[in-house]
Design a protein with these regions (language model features):
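P-loop NTPase Walker
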Residues: 1-71, 168
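Helix N-cap/coil-helix junction residues
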Residues: 15, 43, 91-92, 146, ...
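Conserved helicase NTPase motor core
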Residues: 21, 29, 49, 124-195
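Class I S-adenosyl-L-methionine
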Residues: 31-34, 38, 83, 138, ...
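ATP-hydrolysis module of ASCE/P-loop NTPase motor domains
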Residues: 47, 66-151
Length: 195
């Protein structure tokens, strides 16, 4: 298990706990991991960083760009923007709520898998309509100076590619990275972790 690997690294190889990063998919899993680690280490608090992909990437962006909660687009704001975009683009919709959820998921798929918008085929509307919706959604989001949850991953990737000194800082900080449920990560998560 990950907890036994962490204990092994610390006790056998004398790795400093501060150099270990554990990434999970949910806050609940992160909390469980911290509890199990504390129990495995005889109830001692160990300064291993444990968090979700979004939490860790947001922390990096917050440190680099001084972002705060005011920069995060809520789900409600996201759907409000998409509702306006769909109306302005005159996209035909049968069930608005389902359509909004599906379009938001497709936008997330593009970002999470670093797909090309030009070759992406939407299951919900024509390619031209989807590209128009995507571009206007992105323009509206940027105008508000906000990022959505998927942007946290994309921006972290772009940050590390464009600013090697920032990447180097985080590589030195976290020399050991362990991922819970590694087989479930998406392309952008993999690309950032691999760096």
């Amino acid at each position: 298990t990950i907890v036994s690997r962490i204990k092994y690294l610390i006790e056998k190889y004398k790795v400093r706990p501060e150099e270990i990063l554990v990434v999970t998919f949910t806050r609940y899993a992160a909390g469980e991991m911290k509890s199990r680690l504390c129990a495995a280490m005889d109830q001692r608090e160990i300064p291993v960083t444990v968090g979700t992909f979004h939490g860790i990437y947001y922390g990096i962006l917050r440190w680099t760009y001084r972002m705060g909660p005011q920069n995060i687009l809520s789900e409600e704001e996201k759907y409000q923007i998409l509702r306006g975009v769909i109306s302005r683009q005159k996209v035909e919709v049968f069930d608005e709520e389902d359509f909004l959820q599906d379009i938001a998921a497709e936008i997330g798929r593009i970002k999470n898998n670093r797909l090309d918008i030009e070759s992406f085929v939407s299951e919900k509307c024509s390619a031209d309509a989807f590209r128009a919706v995507y571009r206007e959604y992105e323009a509206q989001r940027k105008k508000l100076k906000k990022i959505d949850f998927d942007d946290m991953l994309v921006l972290c990737y772009e940050l590390f590619v464009s600013r090697p000194e920032v990447l180097s800082r985080w590589q030195k900080k976290f020399r050991y990275i362990l991922i819970d449920e590694f087989q479930d990560i998406n392309r952008i998560q993999y690309d950032v972790i691999r760096m």
